């Protein structure tokens, strides 16, 4: 597991490919302006994993983010978070977020809205998130996603 741990601010930033080729992300602790560059490095690692999984599984990149340990999130790291969500729009990816509380949930909702991402959902449990990530699109949803042929 690739892990960046900073004891000073008690932050943990993890990114790894796990079972089912799901990209598992963990963000925990105080995400402060002082730790901005550590957060940027982590988002770059996530982008690399998304690219790799997109090459391995075109059209089916899955991410599961555990954020229940986030106790503080300052303004400066919001920029690379927004850039990460924008970057991932170019890939057919589903992202599930688990454990967001109060202000973290509001922050995520805002960033999701600002980036116009429709394939990110927040869940209370990892089990609920995995069920959603692994569900196949319905026939109706598949037809909505199919290219329209010229008449």
Which stretches of residues belong to each language-model region?
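Amphipathic, Lys/Arg-enriched alpha-helical "gate/interface" segment within cytosolic domains
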Residues: 1-151
């Amino acid at each position: 597991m690739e892990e960046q741990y900073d004891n000073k601010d008690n932050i943990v930033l993890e990114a790894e490919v796990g079972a089912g080729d799901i990209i598992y992300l963990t963000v925990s602790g105080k995400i402060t302006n002082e730790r901005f560059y550590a957060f940027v490095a982590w988002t770059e690692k996530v982008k690399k994993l998304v690219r790799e999984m997109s090459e391995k599984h075109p059209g089916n990149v899955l991410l599961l983010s555990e954020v229940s340990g986030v106790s503080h999130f300052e303004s400066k790291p919001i920029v690379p978070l927004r850039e990460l969500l924008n970057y991932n729009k170019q890939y057919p990816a589903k992202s599930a977020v688990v454990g967001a509380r109060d202000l973290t949930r509001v922050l995520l909702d805002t960033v999701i809205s600002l980036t116009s991402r429709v394939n990110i959902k927040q869940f209370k449990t990892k089990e609920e998130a995995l069920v959603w990530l692994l569900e196949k699109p319905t026939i109706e949803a598949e037809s909505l996603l199919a290219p329209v042929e010229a008449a």
